[in-house]
Each structure stands twice: as structure tokens, then as C-alpha cells.
Amino acid sequence: MIGVFVIALVLVTPSAAWMRKLDRIAGALQELRDAGVVVLFSPMQEMNGVWFWWGIDSHRTDPEPYIRVYRAMHDFFNKEKGLDNLIWVYSPTSTYGNETVTNYVFRAVDWAYPGDNYVDIIAGTNYADDMSISDYPTYIKMGKPLGNAGFGPSSDGPFLKNGTWDLSRIIERIKKDYPRIAFWESWHSYPGSSWSMISNLNADILLADPFVINRDDLPWNIK
């Protein structure tokens, strides 16, 4: 019930605590702006799942509360704080083919989309042993540049525990089936799990592929 309370009331009379949080975030982002750093910013991601307070448990039949909070945050950072170094990333969780309104865990990836004027890039998260992105056709229809904001082996598959997920297959899958994916972000490992690239097989092969641009290949001009 905490989630229901927070998402429903956060914008009714914006609380001092909420605004202090946004101010602190804005302060850090301003430092990056002043240093010439552009930020891929994906606030309140995986909103179409149940595990965060801003997720569907707080508004099961209506995405409007999430959309209002996202838009208000966007306007606060962009207009009031002048943070023109932010690239806004809409980052839902993959539905893994379970995007029905009656499903307890997921809503469709575009269910809480805040609108084209509030999103620059769409980059969902996706954890699948076969490296499939079931929502890719929907992402294409949404008409924005695409990325993958979190990937790794399935949470209930064999690779998560033993670190034998073959990363060399990722780039081949992207080339063949998901060519609009422009970047990806690996999740980290923690005790008992092997999510990260370095914890699995053939990360060096993946990063050495000519299709991949690494950090050292980029023309950094930050002063």
C-alpha cells in the first residue's frame, strides 16, 4: 500500500521531501552539465512491472499517475533547472510475452509511455537466456532510437548461477534480429548471481567485434 500512496499523491501537493530529492539530483546533474557531460537519464525505469513503488501495483488500471510524475520531473529538470545535457530514456521491462492487462506482473512496454515530447530514446531492460527481445516490434513502432538499458541471463535459468552465458552470441543476435539496438548496458553481479559481462563467457570476443564501439574508440572532448 505504500506504493499506492506515493505515486497517487506525490503531485497533488508536492512534498518538501520529494522536491528536496529532485533538487539533490538536479545539483549532481548540473555539475555534469558544467563539465560538458551528456547524461542518458532513465528515471523510474521498469514502470510496467510490480517491483518498484512507481510500478503497476500503485495504479493497476491507469498509467496516468506515472505519466504525470514523469512529465513533471522532465519539466522540472529541463525547464526550471535548465538541464539541457539530459537525454531522456524511457526504459520499461520486457514483458517476455506476458503483456495482457490482467497479468499480475507486467503491462505492455508502451502502457505508461509519457509521450514523444518527453522521451528521446527507448531502451527497455531484458533478461533472457536466448537473448530474445520479445517487445522489439513494439519498440520499432514507437518511432524512437533504441537501446537496451539492462541485459543479462534469465533470473530463473541455469546461467545466472554458473556464469556460462555466452556473450559472443549477443552481437550476432543484434545484427541478425535487432539491428535498431544502438547500445546496451550490462547489469552487475552480486553474491550468488552472475549477471555482469565479466562474470560470463566471451566478454572479450563481444567487445572486440568490429560492430561494437568501445569507450576508447570515442572522441572524448570533455574539458
Language-model-detected regions and their locations in the chain:
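Glycoside hydrolase catalytic-domain groove-lining segments
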Residues: F106, A112-P158, S196-N214
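Substrate-binding cleft of secreted/luminal carbohydrate-active enzymes
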Residues: G147-K223
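Substrate-binding cleft of extracellular glycoside hydrolase catalytic domains
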Residues: M1-G3, A8-L83
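Loop/turn elements at helix/coil->beta-strand transitions in domains of secreted/extracellular proteins
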Residues: D34-L40, K79-W88, N117-I121, K141-G147, ...
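Long, well-ordered alpha-helical scaffolding segments within enzyme catalytic domains
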Residues: K21-G27, T61-K81, S134-A149, F159-D177
